[in-house]
Amino acid sequence: MQQTAALPKRLSCDRCYAQKLRCPRPSTNDDASCIRCLRQKVQCVYSTALPKGRPRAAVRACAAGAGATAGAPPITTTTTTAAPSSSDTAPPIFSTEDLASLTGLSTSGWLPDPTWEDSFCFLSSQVVPQPPPLDTTPPPRSLSASGLDNPENCVGRLSDLATRLHAVYQTTRALSDHPLITNAAFEAVTTLFNAPLSPPSAATTAATTNLRETFTSSRHLLETISHLLWATPNNNPSTAPAAAADETVIYHFTIACYSLLLLIYATLLTALHRDALTHTQPSLSTTTTTTGPDNNTSTWCSAPSLVELRLVLLFHMITYFLDRLQQMIRMYTAEFEKQASNSTTGRRPPTSGRWSEEVEEMMVVEEPWEREQHIPPPPPPTSSLGSISELETQARAALMQLRMSLVATRGGLVDN
């Protein structure tokens, strides 16, 4: 003990030395405890100073930091000198237990190397994952509005659309021979949503390609009719006869595309109804776990199969397309007949592309779950839509059959 007392003591106590803080002592008190230890009411311990001839702790930390960073001594120097100045005015942030543990570490002679912070600086830019950059490329548009302003381009687009739909319609008879058309239709929907503009791969079947063309053509026809409804009519008297002829051709091409889509959807819905009857009926070997026949818990609570889930998705998607197509065709027909009556009576057509109040009333279409039947009332005899009302009835009847089969299945996949 006498040899240890003879050695010089460190100017700072162990607590202040471990925290790299100043160690102020009261000048009026004979006690050797520093102000910080007195404030925390802990024992103030002064350890033995380092052997003579070695640099002080601050100088040794600067030299070690300069050797570790190899070329960045200003950063290390700034870090070691700025920390004490900012901590002098800050209140103590360590509890009594933390300070006691730090005191024990300082007494044992183990201190953290101040160069560790500089050695692990590379982790901030290499280990922490950064979010990927945002893709600012706008999504491609399937139809160009500027191209549809020209009647010749619009006729060309509708003619190509009718040609593709006619080719698809010729192959729809094979849908009745397909073993499971639900999977092919769902694959067509998946490829349509993933890459709308990419060509089909070699692995896709002919049925998947044709069904994808059906869904794509439905969307293109909706976009074309929407543009035709909002297009400003031609008010030039000199070009009015030619414009009326172009509008007549465009209208008949639109009705032809709509008729082909109705035929294709009617055949597709019939094939889906066959799949629903084959793959969604509950098994006859299912046992009844309750007393009543209406409370077959094992059948009602069983998980739906993948085919059943795909049928529900296809049912709602086809319902949406049929509702939107019928709604847009009704509005476009009303606007076309209004323009035709104005041209025959000599009245000036409206100067804006907005449709009349009668057409706006047609926009209020009830959802499939809000109406009792899916088959709408037939159009009036004077309307030019009388020729396609039978096709709409066939498509709606096939949709109703598929809906009833999904309602009757286990769990009631579609609300009644």
Curated annotation (Swiss-Prot):
Task: Output compositional bias ranges, type Pro residues.
Answer: 130-141
Q: What coarse category fits the chief subcellular location reported for this protein? A: membrane
Q: Determine the domain of life of the protein's source.
A: Eukaryota
Task: List where the protein spans the membrane.
Answer: 249-269, 302-322
Show the GO MF annotations: DNA binding; DNA-binding transcription factor activity, RNA polymerase II-specific; zinc ion binding
Question: Known SUPFAM superfamilies for this protein?
Answer: Zn2/Cys6 DNA-binding domain (SSF57701)
Q: List, alphabetically, the InterPro entries matched.
A: Zn2-C6_fun-type_DNA-bd_sf (IPR036864), Zn2Cys6_DnaBD (IPR001138)
Where does this protein bind DNA? 13-44
Known Gene3D superfamilies for this protein? Zn(2)-C6 fungal-type DNA-binding domain
From the UniProt entry, list the residue stretches annotated as the region Disordered.
68-90, 130-150
A cellular-component GO term for this protein: membrane
Q: How does it sit in the membrane?
A: Multi-pass membrane protein
Where in the cell does this protein reside?
Membrane; Nucleus
Task: Tell me which UniProt keywords the record has, alphabetically.
Answer: DNA-binding, Membrane, Metal-binding, Nucleus, Transcription, Transcription regulation, Transmembrane, Transmembrane helix, Zinc
Instruction: From the UniProt record, give one GO term of the biological process aspect.
Output: positive regulation of metabolic process
Functionally, this protein is described as follows: Transcription factor that positively regulates the expression of the gene cluster that mediates the biosynthesis of the acyltetronic acid derivatives carlosic acid, agglomerin F and carlosic acid methyl ether.
Q: What is this protein called?
A: Transcription factor caaR
Query: Lineage from the top down?
Result: Eukaryota, Fungi, Dikarya, Ascomycota, Pezizomycotina
